[in-house]
Amino acid sequence: MNYDSQQPPLPPLPYAGCRRASGFPALGRGGTVPVGVWGGAGQGREGRSWGEGPRGPGLGRRDLSSADPAVLGATMESRCYGCAVKFTLFKKEYGCKNCGRAFCSGCLSFSAAVPRTGNTQQKVCKQCHEVLTRGSSANASKWSPPQNYKKRVAALEAKQKPSTSQSQGLTRQDQMIAERLARLRQENKPKLVPSQAEIEARLAALKDERQGSIPSTQEMEARLAALQGRVLPSQTPQPAHHTPDTRTQAQQTQDLLTQLAAEVAIDESWKGGGPAASLQNDLNQGGPGSTNSKRQANWSLEEEKSRLLAEAALELREENTRQERILALAKRLAMLRGQDPERVTLQDYRLPDSDDDEDEETAIQRVLQQLTEEASLDEASGFNIPAEQASRPWTQPRGAEPEAQDVDPRPEAEEEELPWCCICNEDATLRCAGCDGDLFCARCFREGHDAFELKEHQTSAYSPPRAGQEH
């Protein structure tokens, strides 16, 4: 019974843009398309899902190229069997003389001798052209396994033939046991034992081999150090061993003094008789000796010159420093006298040269006299303090009334203040009313006030309170 004859006629394909049978548009499962391929390439009739047909499971969307040509031929009505192009007025239909399928002129471009037409050259499709030109022998050789595979299979069959004759009538398990037993026997066979002659020949060959010299330990260490990038052990400097000094400190001092005395004696002997003796010896020599003595004499002169210049520069710096100090002292003295310190020059206080001892003593006496005058001026000015008040501490009379406290009102907090100078933390001797009652020593008060403040600021003597008066 022909099953295909009972199928209804299939509608034509509406896809004119397809180039081949396997190039249909991708369709989702369960879709409905007018592709009437019985066997699964879409839906041929309504109510059938994708991949189903009257013949069971279909070919699937990707199996159109492997479908039966007879089935696909029914669906390719008025279309090219090779590129699925619809035949039109400009795309005419041609038939293959061998298989009879419809092709366009582009797909039917091969020529071959067709047996149906008396081996005459006819237009055929590509598949028929390959079949007709290669023949059956070519197809057989195309799908035939290689010769090496055939030889191995034949050798395996020949090897298994005797075992098959012995294992006839045995079950599968018995055959497996027999094969395992044969393998164990093959493994337990004694190996080939070499003869006495072979052993002697091998021993003689080993003795005849030329044995190289064994490297020494030093060579191996050197090679290892070279590979690791380290210093060779032979080139490593040995650590110097210093014996401990067992001398006492007094002995070390005495030895050091002896060494210094010996070095001084050598220097004195070289300075005393060395140059003269060398010059006398150079009189009997030619050129090289005289040149060496000249070089040595020149070097000594240069060294003496450098030393004298250094001493002169040092003396000049000391002289400048001394003059600056004298000028500063003169300006300070002029300020205390009430003169303009800018008009004071160093000519007024020029000291004689220090080469003369008597003049230097005179200069020292002059400086001392100036300092004495400065001290007397400080006492004369007194910073508005009487001399007897500066020498005698301030005490309150016993019979003083409480109203006397109004003259110099002091809060209770000031009684606990520290008796130190507010600048240098020395013992305070003055209290300046113009500086909010701050405590000063005589030196800081003089340096911290200018000429106007020294005249205007009122001061009073200050003595630190005793321990019994604090509380």
From Swiss-Prot:
Post-translational modification: Phosphorylated in vitro at Ser-22 by AURKB; however, phosphorylation at this site could not be confirmed in vivo.
Principal cellular location given in the protein's record: cytoplasm
GO biological process, any: negative regulation of cytokinesis
Keyword Cell division: yes
Keywords: Cell cycle, Cell division, Chromosomal rearrangement, Ciliopathy, Coiled coil, Cytoplasm, Cytoskeleton, Disease variant, Intrahepatic cholestasis, Isopeptide bond, Lipid-binding, Metal-binding, Phosphoprotein, Proto-oncogene, Ubl conjugation, Zinc, Zinc-finger
Zinc finger regions, FYVE-type: 74-133
Binding site for Zn(2+) 1: 80, 83, 104, 107
Region (Disordered): 39-64, 271-299, 386-412
MIM1-A (motif): residue ranges: 174-187
The protein, known as: Abscission/NoCut checkpoint regulator
Species whose genome carries this gene: Homo sapiens
